[in-house]
């Protein structure tokens, strides 16, 4: 009875509903996939590809308007890779770091800006793909594979000597570090994105007339920071794996 009265009183109550742990499952053989994650991810990827195409289809020697903005983004992402990986080794890793940053930023902003709850699904709800732990773990494992590849490609099997440096006593700690890196990356991103959506939903429920725009704006800022942290740490791990090979 109380909930019904609250829903009638709050015109935005549909936006404050939160379903945690419910998913739209797609079955492929014996596999069960979280369909809502794929739907929003595909939309984000399509939006990024469209923006990239529009910004680069008519390149000018003197950039104007949209091209100028795209070049600013590219220089910003190049600086992240250069500062963390090193001036001599960063270029091959710019596409990976840029893809991480833009995809995470797009997913976070899609969850913060688009009222997905107005779209009803048979089960679960559309939301930012990064509020699904499977997405953040997958991104973190990609970074783990990337820095293992970076270290092995530069040092060969000598890369594994780092586990017993400066003393073999640190072997268990160095091995544990390889597990804690993806764990910290994935849970930090997942926790912050999920917490932001929950806070916005609670404020929307408590404030019956106005959607809490200041909280949403703060969420956009926090989402951008999380994308920056994830991509910067990924670049730092790659640079650490190649340490000692940045100088010629």
Swiss-Prot record:
InterPro entries xrefs: ATP_syn_F0_a_bact/chloroplast, ATP_synth_F0_asu, ATP_synth_F0_asu_AS, F0_ATP_A_sf
GO CC field: chloroplast thylakoid membrane; plasma membrane; proton-transporting ATP synthase complex
Topological relation to the membrane, as annotated: Multi-pass membrane protein
CDD domains on file: ATP-synt_Fo_a_6
Keyword Mitochondrion: no
One protein family per Pfam: ATP-synt_A
GO molecular function, one term: proton-transporting ATP synthase activity, rotational mechanism
TM region positions: 35-55, 94-114, 133-153, 202-222, 224-244
PANTHER family, A to Z: ATP SYNTHASE SUBUNIT A, CHLOROPLASTIC
Role, per record: Key component of the proton channel; it plays a direct role in the translocation of protons across the membrane.
Protein name per its UniProtKB record: ATP synthase subunit a, chloroplastic
Organism, scientific name: Porphyra purpurea (Red seaweed)
């Amino acid at each position: 009875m109380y909930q019904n009265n609250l829903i009638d009183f709050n015109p935005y109550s549909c936006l404050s509903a939160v379903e945690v742990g419910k998913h739209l499952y797609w079955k492929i053989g014996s596999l069960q996939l979280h369909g809502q994650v794929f739907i929003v991810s595909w939309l984000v990827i399509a939006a990024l590809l469209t923006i990239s195409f529009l910004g680069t289809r008519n390149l000018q020697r003197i950039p104007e308007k949209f091209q100028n903005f795209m070049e600013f983004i590219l220089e910003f992402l190049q600086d992240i890779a250069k500062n963390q990986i090193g001036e001599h080794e960063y270029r091959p890793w710019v596409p990976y770091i840029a893809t991480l940053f833009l995809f995470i930023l797009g997913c976070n902003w899609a969850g913060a800006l688009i009222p997905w709850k107005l779209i009803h699904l048979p089960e679960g709800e559309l939301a930012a793909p990064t509020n699904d732990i499977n997405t953040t773990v997958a991104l973190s494992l990609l970074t783990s594979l990337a820095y293992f590849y970076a270290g092995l490609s530069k040092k060969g099997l000598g890369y594994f000597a780092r586990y017993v440096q400066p003393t073999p006593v640190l072997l268990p700690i160095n091995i544990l570090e390889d597990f804690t890196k993806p764990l910290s990356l994935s849970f930090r991103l997942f926790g912050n994105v999920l917490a932001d959506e929950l806070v916005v939903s609670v404020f929307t429920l408590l404030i019956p007339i106005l959607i809490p725009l200041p909280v949403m704006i703060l969420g956009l800022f926090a989402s951008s920071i999380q994308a920056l942290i994830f991509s910067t740490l990924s670049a730092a791990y790659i640079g650490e794996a190649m340490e000692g090979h940045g100088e010629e």
